[in-house]
Amino acid sequence: MPMNIPNLITVLRVLLIPIFILLFYLPYHWSYMAASSVFALAAATDWLDGYLARRLEQSTPFGAFLDPVADKLMVAVALVLLVQAHANFWLTLPAAVIIGREIVISALREWMAELGARAQVAVSNLGKWKTAAQMVALIILLANAPAFTFWVVLGYVLLMIAAGLTLWSMVQYLRAAWPHLRPTTEEK
């Protein structure tokens, strides 16, 4: 399989994950900011790879598969790191909501694809807003030590907003898929 520029950027995003994990755990005063910077770079590549794939007409099945996987890995790893570091309700609850939603929607998309109705659960604008809120919250939280500061509280608030958007988008996806989830007359 030949690798084009958008796919290479997506692979780079996955390869940046262990780097930001390592930076997060380094015992230096600058490590949180460095980890956050690498995470921000990885988040920016999410926009860049999609833009280039469309602009250069280089969309591929591999890129369509790997892009959402890279996003989910990046967000889940960041949330796990932060839950471990902060160990409080204000971070754990939205993290559980966000990770849980990603599992539910990934399974729903897989199942809908098997039914030939994948377009019913395509990415929406609300999903894009949810992703933006998550990324900004995670960049802020990764950049700061787990202390009760203005920036950490702002990160918690943004993550709660992201969790709310996450639930709202999940409800929209489930409503769109509902006609396919109901039993047919022969299944009753």
What are these regions (language model features)?
Residues A76, V80, M135-V136:
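Hydrophobic alpha-helical transmembrane segments in multi-pass membrane proteins
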